[in-house]
């Protein structure tokens, strides 16, 4: 069964992507364009040259952070839907440090990043504490905290840190902006995200603490019987996942957007949840999924310019990938589906 489960986790996303592109090609053909040509420009727009590759990595960076946030929390069996709010809180604190505290250069960058991570972790801990000590539903709490964080950001860029008559904050000083990564349009935030993904993978699958955290996520009752501190791991999962999202928000501010403005987070939190589910909560696979979705978004611009196919076709492909993958992975967990494989294995034996 374990081998069948692994095959399903690999097979279903791959087939979902292929079917989604096939449906996208049919839609493009119905619109009167050449599907192969459109998809070729979609690829070129994302990976065709160094500039486009850097843009893809830059667009993937915040998605990687929110995907890793969801992967880590869900591995412990807690549903942190507040990645976007934690992302925003991290950016708010980084913006305050960057514009109001006279620390520049590497110390300034590190201070902003640390403030973002701490802020995101503490913001997530609100939901964790309410779940552990009051029995509240973490999904509802984290969604509510998303709205609060968004409204708080609005107060920041329209009042507290407003720059002139425009509802936005001042740009962060050049001294704390992130340097580029290998001369690409992406910044060093991209390799930082990759390193964090590797660290999460190592922690979850190569340490005893990570094993206990996953055990709590798989069966909290059995973990409690074996003496695991359930509260400790639940709170830790909220704190760490929130810190990851908060760090992502801080680095997005310092490396790409440079100021707080309406639409800063751009739905990164819920995108991360969807990508984590597609990746079956595996941090390394989550990185690949985030880059894939970023490539679709970046490449769709060239596809539209060259062939006239609107970028909404790329959005349709993304939505289909999510629906097919999540539905397929849910289906293989149904008892009837599992029994089918069990009977097949017995017949072969």
Residue positions per predicted region:
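Short, non-helical or kinked segments that cap or interrupt transmembrane helices
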Residues: 33-37, 74-91, 132-141, 212, ...
């Amino acid at each position: 069964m374990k081998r069948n489960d692994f095959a399903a986790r690999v097979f279903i996303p791959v087939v979902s992507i292929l079917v989604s592109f096939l449906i996208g090609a049919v839609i493009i053909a119905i619109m009167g364009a050449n599907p192969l040509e459109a998809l070729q420009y979609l690829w070129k727009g994302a990976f065709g040259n160094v500039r486009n590759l850097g843009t893809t990595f830059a667009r993937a960076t915040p998605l990687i952070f929110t995907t890793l946030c969801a992967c880590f929390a869900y591995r412990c069996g807690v549903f942190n839907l507040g990645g976007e709010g934690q992302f925003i809180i991290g950016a708010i604190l980084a913006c305050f440090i960057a514009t109001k505290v006279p620390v520049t250069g590497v110390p300034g960058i590190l201070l902003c990043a640390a403030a973002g991570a701490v802020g995101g972790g503490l913001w997530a801990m609100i939901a964790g504490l309410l779940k552990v000590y009051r029995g509240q539903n973490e999904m509802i709490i984290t969604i509510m905290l998303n709205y609060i964080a968004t409204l708080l950001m609005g107060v920041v860029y329209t009042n507290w840190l407003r720059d002139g008559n425009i509802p936005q904050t001042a740009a962060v000083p050049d001294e704390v902006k992130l340097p580029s990564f290998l001369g690409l349009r992406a910044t060093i935030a991209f390799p930082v995200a990759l390193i964090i993904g590797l660290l999460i993978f190592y922690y979850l699958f190569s340490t005893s603490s990570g094993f206990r955290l996953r055990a709590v996520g798989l069966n909290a009752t059995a973990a409690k019987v074996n003496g695991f501190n359930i509260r400790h791991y639940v709170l830790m999962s909220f704190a760490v996942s929130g810190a990851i999202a908060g760090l992502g928000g801080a680095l997005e501010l310092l490396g790409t957007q440079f100021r707080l403005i309406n639409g800063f987070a751009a739905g990164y939190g819920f995108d991360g949840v969807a990508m984590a589910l597609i990746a079956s909560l595996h941090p390394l696979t989550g990185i690949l999924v985030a880059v894939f979705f970023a490539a679709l978004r970046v490449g769709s611009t060239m596809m539209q310019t060259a062939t006239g196919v609107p970028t909404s076709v790329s959005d349709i492909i993304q939505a289909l990938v999510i629906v097919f993958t999540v539905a397929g992975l849910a289906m293989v967990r149904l008892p009837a589906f599992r029994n089918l494989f069990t009977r097949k294995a017995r017949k072969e034996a």
